[in-house]
């Protein structure tokens, strides 16, 4: 099952028109980041959180580590993480039952094979069909510990046909073409 979470903002927050300002706003929004953190903490099984901007990924990783149980393993992976370390993390997560990996789309959307992955969270907006399907593919690998995986695709609605909601609409089109079952849940951040 794929869950799409659409975050809505207050009228004052909905005046952003520039793409870069919009991305800066959502990646620095405390309630949005706390929602992602709390979702990670509440989910059972191994969870992959995918981000676009390194600064955002680092922040999410620290936020998650602060609240995660002391025995819950959390990892941060980005382009600067050497391949040996990536492989060690992959091996550890394959054996874990409740790890959290915060990773960049560029590194983890392709080429990393973790079959023991139960949840994927898209923490950053984008519209690429290939990246979308490759990222979902991380969770489709079979493993004896799961019947399937869940995707949490977080979108941001500024009520003005903003850039990130346009990207979300494109992703919904992909999900419809691929005949994925999904549910849209609105979350007010007011």
Regions found by a protein language model. Name each.
Residues 1-2:
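Short, small-residue-biased leader/transition segments that mark boundaries at the very start
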Residues 7-9, 54-56, 107-109, 125-129, ...:
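Conserved nucleotide-binding/hydrolysis micro-motifs of P-loop NTPases
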Residues 10-69:
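Conserved interdomain hinge at the start of the Helicase C-terminal
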Residues 48, 58-59, 71-112:
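Conserved helicase ATPase core of P-loop NTP-dependent helicases/translocases
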Residues 70-73, 115-119, 144-151, 178-180:
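Short glycine-/polar-rich loops that comprise or flank the Walker A/P-loop
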Residues 102-103, 110-125, 133-134, 148-154:
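A short beta-strand element within the Helicase C-terminal
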Residues 138-172:
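Conserved segment of the helicase C-terminal RecA-like domain
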Residues 150, 166-190:
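Long, hydrophobic alpha-helical segments
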């Amino acid at each position: 099952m794929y869950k799409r979470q659409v975050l809505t903002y207050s009228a004052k927050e909905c005046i952003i028109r520039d793409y870069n300002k919009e991305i800066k706003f959502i990646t620095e929004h405390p309630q949005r980041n706390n929602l992602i953190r709390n979702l990670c903490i509440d989910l059972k099984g191994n969870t992959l959180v995918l981000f676009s901007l390194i600064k955002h990924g680092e922040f999410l990783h620290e936020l998650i580590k602060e609240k995660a149980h002391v025995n819950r393993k959390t990892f941060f992976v980005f382009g600067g993480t050497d391949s040996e370390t990536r492989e060690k993390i992959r091996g550890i997560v394959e054996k874990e039952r409740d790890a959290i990996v915060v990773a960049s789309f560029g590194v983890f959307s392709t080429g990393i094979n973790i079959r023991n992955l139960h949840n994927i969270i898209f923490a950053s907006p984008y519209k690429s069909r290939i990246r979308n399907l490759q990222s979902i593919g991380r969770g489709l690998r079979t493993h004896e510990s799961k019947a399937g995986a869940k995707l949490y695709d977080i979108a941001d609605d500024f009520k003005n046909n903003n850039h990130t909601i346009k990207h979300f609409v494109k992703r919904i089109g992909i999900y419809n073409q691929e005949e994925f079952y999904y549910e849209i849940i609105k979350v007010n951040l007011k």
